[in-house]
Amino acid sequence: MWNYSLTVEEVALVCQVGYERQAEMFGQPERNVNYYEGDHWEMLQHTICAGSELAFARMIGIKEFTPHVNKFKTELDVDGFEVRYTFPQGCNAPCCASESSRGRLRMTRRDDDDQIYVLLGGGLAIRTKMETPPYTMPPYVALGWAYGHECKKPEFIYNATTWYVPRADLHPMDTLDLSNVQGMRQLL
């Protein structure tokens, strides 16, 4: 119930979104807010995260959804939710987060305390060889959720502007209220 494998058409869509999210930064490493890993890795990271947004929309029954290009958090990732992604253990590509942050929901001081944040893992960060149709992608998995204010506790502080919430401290997905989601189907 709380996992979804993108179709090959959906992968093509999130690749386009990943490109568009990074395009305005091409060749300008000084514009990155945190640090710069190279446009190719930044674009891949945007692609993987756009995939997590699309997968979550499908998990909650939203069929008509395209991840937006807006990276400045003036729009929610999915109707009513912010989606965060955690890279899998053992991922050593430059676009993967540090080992200490894996399996955790990342929050910054810019994040809304009243918003719901959902953590996903898996998906396109897992390299696989697809040889025959239907070319099944590794599934994205919803790992848990929390309100922003629940994440900004002293025990989760990483540095002056960031918190990392362990998966064990997130609410189980089956407790997520989906009653206000437009286009939502009944989850069985």
Model-based region annotation:
Residues M1-D77, R84-L188:
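Nucleic-acid endonuclease domains
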